[in-house]
């Protein structure tokens, strides 16, 4: 009987009909559904991972740190072997990730670097410093700062994102590296004097918080189409830009006299604002590109090989340099959004109606 069973197993193996190994489980933890870009990131990644044969556990944490921690704990309990995490607070996950490391689970920090945890194996993001320099250089060009003098300065205010998001160091840092020389020469002037990261931060990247701060600046500085001159507002991303735009519209600005407002993510409301002349530009980070890159990293980890990496010097999370892959950002504006967003299939024309 034993010989018969052995022969049957051997035959199954020879014909390729032996039972398949269990599929690798991948946990994907996104911060919130309230921002369009995280919905797209999560859905694109889940689609790509499922297509590659993985079991995907996609969770959104409603911008609640305790909820994200609990969701990751549940992923570990269910046997997820690889975690892809876009953190709410980059410094709040050390405890649960210590558990992941003990269980041999590999962690990929997604777009936001997870800080102070040696459980982070890799980081996948866009070149976030370049995002800031793109925004800064756009302002230099559109405000004609290289041909101005301090007798005819351009006037600007500054907004960046949440102080618990490590990325603002790169977004805001890149932009300010470009713009600081013009501020020092007096060619560019911030009337409020609020130019430090702490002064310009927006908790949770909140549209409402950005709108309230912009309204306060408008009141304090008497900005308006018939008031004190305001040429531009630097915004690190679109959710802040939307709040800024709301406040400027409320102050009476129209497409004919709207200050130059920057952004990031090419979210639908911001693209519509660009078309309407109420936002100048937004840095485009194609989530399909990043999702595909993460799938390659997950594949390599699952196969025990080295994931593709193109940066080993930039991102130190407090425990050492995290091997990273940086995708390339570009900017969209009213002149190129059709080729960038519609022709590429990222959006349909109906999405932007």
PLM region descriptions:
Residues 2-10:
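Sec-dependent signal peptide recognition
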Residues 13-17:
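Hydrophobic core
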Residues 20-353:
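A residue-level marker of the well-folded mature domains of exported/periplasmic proteins
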């Amino acid at each position: 009987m034993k010989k018969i069973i052995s022969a049957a197993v051997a035959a199954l193996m020879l014909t390729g009909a032996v039972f398949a190994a269990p599929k690798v489980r991948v946990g994907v933890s996104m911060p919130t559904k309230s921002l369009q870009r995280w919905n797209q990131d999560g859905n694109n990644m889940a689609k790509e991972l499922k297509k590659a044969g993985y079991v995907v556990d996609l969770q959104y944490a409603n911008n609640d740190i305790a909820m994200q921690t609990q969701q990751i704990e549940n992923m570990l309990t269910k046997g997820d072997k690889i975690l892809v995490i876009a953190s709410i607070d980059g410094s709040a996950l050390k405890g649960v990730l210590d558990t992941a490391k003990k269980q041999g689970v590999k962690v990929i920090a997604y777009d936001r670097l997870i800080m102070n945890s040696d459980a982070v194996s890799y980081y996948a993001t866009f070149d976030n410093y370049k995002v800031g320099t793109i925004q800064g250089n756009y302002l230099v060009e559109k405000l004609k700062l290289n041909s101005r003098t301090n007798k005819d300065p351009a006037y600007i205010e500054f907004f960046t994102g949440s102080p618990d998001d490590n990325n603002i160091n790169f977004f805001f840092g890149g932009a300010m590296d470009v713009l600081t020389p013009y501020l020092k020469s007096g060619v560019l002037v911030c009337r409020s004097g609020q130019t430090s990261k702490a002064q310009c931060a927006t908790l949770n990247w909140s549209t409402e918080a950005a709108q309230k701060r912009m309204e306060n600046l408008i009141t304090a500085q008497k900005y308006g189409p018939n008031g004190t001159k305001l040429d531009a507002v630097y915004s690190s991303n679109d959710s802040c830009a939307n709040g800024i735009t709301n406040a400027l519209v409320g102050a009476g600005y129209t497409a004919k006299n709207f200050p130059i407002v920057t952004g990031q993510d090419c979210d639908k409301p911001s693209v519509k604002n660009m078309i309407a002349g109420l936002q100048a530009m937004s840095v485009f980070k194609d989530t399909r590109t990043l999702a595909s890159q993460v799938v390659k990293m997950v594949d390599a980890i699952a196969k025990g090989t080295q994931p593709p990496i193109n940066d080993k010097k930039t991102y130190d999370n407090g425990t050492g340099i995290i091997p990273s892959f940086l995708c390339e950002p570009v900017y969209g504006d009213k002149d190129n959004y059709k080729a960038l967003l519609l022709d590429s299939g990222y959006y349909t024309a109906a999405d932007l109606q």
